Amino acid sequence: MSKIRIGYRLARLGLVVSTGTILTVLFQRGTLPPKGIQSRVTRWWHRNIAKSLGVPVRIYGTPNREATLFVSNHISSFDIPALGSVLPARFLSKIEIKSWPLMGWLATRAGTLYIERGGRQASASANRVMAEALSLKHNVVLFAEGTVTDGNVKRFHSRLLQSAVDAGAWVQPVAIRYPDPDGGLVHPAALFIDDASLKQLAARMLAARQMEVEIYFGEAISAAGSSRDELARYTETEVRKLLDINEPDTKRSS
């Protein structure tokens, strides 16, 4: 890609960050109801980050309109602005993000929920805050694999789906794909390889050609009467179907 086009994208990204920071100071309060000025500002943020990086977001299927736990596979940090551009939703992220300069503050003001590193106690705490958000009719996005992948779907962990059971919320599977024009599983610019920094990821995406993200929404179901394991199994199976990826012959972990 030409240096002129990369420079244009970079300048536009800088303008989006500057404008978005001002809007965040004025309007964001650390929660994200599905309607209202906070939701509009956050979606503006995500939509314009995608545009400034030159990455179209293609939507297939329909997001559920009621308070929903959206359960997705996870490939890239760009999954967040991609989903956030079409969903008024709060994301669950690792606690380390909260301390990042500027980005951590912006994420917190946008209503991000955090999970501590650890076992059952950390999961129980995350379940409580997620269930509270769902009970307030806020949407929540969960990347159920617990890590970024190379495009091959890993097992969906079930522990944090307890939040939907506790809140009596809806659960909807979401599949994310970054088509590779050269025939690979994922466009290489989207991959979060070897603990790459956000700056490195953004640099690759700024220079990428023919890059887009596809988001597929599966059928939403009520969590009422289901166990967290059943919900994990359902969402993982549906995501695999949406991406046409076969299930490996390994045991589930929770």
Task: Give the predicted meaning of each segment.
Residues 20-32, 36, 50-52, 66-120:
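Catalytic core of membrane glycerolipid acyltransferases/transacylases, capturing the structured
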Residues 102-104, 152-234:
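A cross-family acyltransferase "interaction/gating" segment
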